Amino acid sequence: MHNIQLVQEIERHETPLNIRPTSPYTLNPPVERDGFSWPSVGTRQRAEETEEEEKERIQRISGAIKTILTELGEDVNREGLLDTPQRYAKAMLYFTKGYQTNIMDDVIKNAVFEEDHDEMVIVRDIEIYSLCEHHLVPFFGKVHIGYIPNKKVIGLSKLARLAEMYARRLQVQERLTKQIAMALSDILKPLGVAVVMEASHMCMVSRGIQKTGSSTVTSCMLGGFRAHKTREEFLTLLGRRSI
């Protein structure tokens, strides 16, 4: 009965953003089956490169970092910086390892199950770390993911892994929030998906306006969660009155 009422509420409600004919998310889907979103040639190459090609990539990045350090006025031959270019290159590849992750083969695998559960499933307080694509400095915080099953559920740890995959790329928080929501929607075809993210951005804390106490909240509501009552229930369960 709950699902019937929810479907009726969805039908009465405005068409969800991701299926509007004129929506940019319909014309240019932000989530492909391999997990990329508007991928460049370089991300494809990186995902498919051999171990030897990865070593060559590390050397190229190291060379670029040496140039940057030199232009900053540093001596790249002093003891403290001798191995820094190599370490930084490996660190950056780790921070952006999501470019090498396949959403179905590496993240979801066989963790989608038939189940007749028809109430919200919520995983709260998933910690995420990412890099702002504008300044290449970190932003970090927590993401809360909820969905209403439609005969299928997913292993709970996979929600955290899904968030991790998209976070380990050069990102903006708004896009990261949408990618998580739409990927889950694509995989499960649920009655609704809700994602709320709260993060602190080092580009606001350590430079520019330097507001150390600020945080940014973004959300993406799909399907049934675009209806006010369902959204309100989700936010109440998160301990929030609004977003």
From Swiss-Prot:
Q: In which pathway does it act?
A: Cofactor biosynthesis; 7,8-dihydroneopterin triphosphate biosynthesis; 7,8-dihydroneopterin triphosphate from GTP: step 1/1
Name of encoding gene? FOL2
The protein's name in its UniProt record? GTP cyclohydrolase 1
Extent of the signal sequence:
none
Quickly give the catalysed reaction: GTP + H2O = 7,8-dihydroneopterin 3'-triphosphate + formate + H(+)
Q: What does the subunit comment say?
A: Homodimer.
UniProt keywords, alphabetically: Allosteric enzyme, Folate biosynthesis, GTP-binding, Hydrolase, Metal-binding, Nucleotide-binding, Phosphoprotein, Zinc
- Mention any additional remark: Present with 2840 molecules/cell in log phase SD medium.
GO cellular component assignments: cytoplasm; nucleus
Output the lineage of the source organism.
Eukaryota, Fungi, Dikarya, Ascomycota, Saccharomycotina
Family membership noted in the UniProt record: Belongs to the GTP cyclohydrolase I family.
**Pfam families linked to this entry:** GTP_cyclohydroI
Phenotype on deletion?
A: Leads to folinic acid auxotrophy, and lacks any detectable specific enzymatic activity.
Q: Which residues carry this modification: Phosphothreonine?
A: T15
Which species expresses this protein natively? Saccharomyces cerevisiae (strain ATCC 204508 / S288c)
Query: Its function?
Result: GTP cyclohydrolase 1 is the first enzyme in the biosynthetic pathway leading to folic acid.
Q: Which residues carry this modification: Phosphoserine?
A: S23
The UniProt entry, under InterPro entries, shows: GTP-CH-I_C/QueF, GTP-CH-I_N, GTP_CycHdrlase_I, GTP_CycHdrlase_I_CS, GTP_CycHdrlase_I_dom
Keyword Heme listed? The answer is no
In alphabetical order, the GO MF annotations are: GTP binding; GTP cyclohydrolase I activity; zinc ion binding
**Entry EC no(s):** 3.5.4.16
